[in-house]
Structure formats: structure tokens, C-alpha cells
Amino acid sequence: MTATELMTNWPDPSTNQVPTDGALTFVNTYAVLEVTGEDTEKFLQGQCSADIGSLAIGESVPGSICTVKGRVITSFIATKTNESVLLLIPRVLVPTTKEYLKKYAAFFKVSLNQWLHPCVIANPKSGQLPESLYVSCNFRLGEQGFHAGLLDQASYQKLADLLPSYQDKENQPAPESIWLDHLLEAGWLLLNNKTSEEYLPHQLNLDLLGAINFKKGCYTGQEIIARMEYRGKSKKRLKVISLSGHQLTNESLPLDIKTADDSQPLGELLQLTSNAKLALALLPVELPSEGSFICDGETLEYALQNNV
């Protein structure tokens, strides 16, 4: 089995019982946009909702990059190194995010580099990988903590030599879905090409997840985001809900949600866990804690798992 095969073919979670904490997981769904150069901090401060300027080397913080209208292009986890800032973002959004930032980067001494090789490992310390191999990315989303390792191309090539030690039955990598499910349970939406530029940060609860700093100063979209914080109120927010009824898949999302009598728009179903039992849905703030709605032409029973 080659390194690439191991990083793209995951064990079936229904037949492989693996611990949810401390399991070594190779994550292809996320990749890295690296920002380097002497103006890196100044450039990112003008583009990100997070306070990149306050980051010490080795620290990580969640954030977002928004359009001038305040719509979220991508959310990210930023990690500062000696030479750069690494933005951990959904893989499918790395090229489009890079293209968006290029028009601003032209005025700064910075370079934007895509890491599209398999470069993200969840819980690498638990897998006993050498810490010199990766950049640690420790971050919190609300009350939940996460750990990942970010590999540059050279480190990825070194990792290929270590992979045989993870191919025995007692030390198999965990399926990627475990890590992604944990992010969903924390309320972190995996944005994609369909949902990018569709939502305001408050709708995605980025203000509650520590991804917006309201004291850092101006950045693209900041005026609209600040107005929502101080003068407005988001009528809908992302909610973690349990589901029962009709089986859905992430491939079919996003889907419109209607009231139980199928008469009024209610919100959108945006992401499911691997077993489709939990979901992230954009729903009214004042939604009852449990009930039913119509989605994909079927009635689904729901129960709120968070109190947003």
C-alpha cells in the first residue's frame, strides 16, 4: 500500500471500531494555504476576521475571509510559524481563496502557496509521529479542543517512509469521518463551492466560536459584520440537530427546509455526520427545541443539540 493510497482510502467506520479521541487520522478534506513574506501579518490583518497580529509562534486561532458584503468565502484555522501563517481550510476552497486574495496581495510583499498534497493529520501525537515532522495546530471551537499536524511537501515525503508502521491491524489510521464529525458536533461548518459566499459570519456562529475579533480594526467585510454585532440580530443561526426519518446524504446538500405543513420556508440543511444522525442546519433562532420539518419532500423529526 502506497502513501497516497493510505491517505485516500479510509476504513469503513461501520466495521472498524476506533477511538474517537487520540486516533491518528489522515484528512484529505482540508488543505493549507500558506502566506509568507515580510508583510504577511499586515496583509492578513486586512483580510481576516481573526486577530492574526496577536498570534504568537506556534499558536492557532479560527477565523474567516469574507467578501466586501460580509459573506464568508471560507472559514479557517490560522497557525503561525517562524516563516509564515498557515491557513487550514476546506481543500476545495484553497484555489478559489487564493485567487480571491491575489488581488489584495499584489499590494503587499507576500506570497500565497497552495499545499494540495495530503498535508493534514488529526491527532498526530497520539500516532507517535515525530513532532519535527509537522507544524502543530492546536485550536478550540467553543468548548471543544482539536489537534492537527500540517505537513509541507518535504515532510509528507518523509512520512511515506513511516507509514508501514501504521499498516498492522492494531495500529490502523482512523477514518477521516471521525474528525469531521467532531468538528460538526462543535458547530463548525465544512464550507464548499455551493455554500461559499452565501452566509454572514453570525449565521455560521463564527462570533461564538472565537473566529471574529471585534477590536482588531478594519478588514474586508468588517463594517457589515460589526453592524450585525452591535446594531442587528441574526434571525437565523447554524444549529446542531439530531435527525430521524428519511435518510439523507451530504452529496445531496444543501437542501431547503420547510415547515411541517410544507407551506413556509424555514431554513437550510447544510451538513451531516457520517451516519446522518446529526446535522448542521441554518434555522430560526427561536425554533422550538424539538419538532418536525419537511426536507427533500420527506418529514424529518429533529431535536436541538445546542442552545444557540
Kindly give the residue locations of the regions a language model identified.
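Acidic, proline/glycine-enriched N-terminal capping motif
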Residues: 1-73
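Short amphipathic beta-strand starts and helix->beta connectors
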Residues: 13-20, 61-75, 105-106, 127-136, ...
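Acidic, low-complexity central loop/insert segments
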Residues: 21-26, 31-32, 77-186
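Short, conserved charged micro-motifs
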Residues: 39-44, 94-98, 127-129, 154-163, ...
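Short, conserved active-site entrance elements at the starts or edges of catalytic domains
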Residues: 176, 182-206
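Glycine-rich, small/acidic residue-mixed loop/short-helix segments
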Residues: 204, 209-211, 226-308
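Short, surface-exposed secondary-structure edge patches
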Residues: 215-216
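Structural motif
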Residues: 222-223
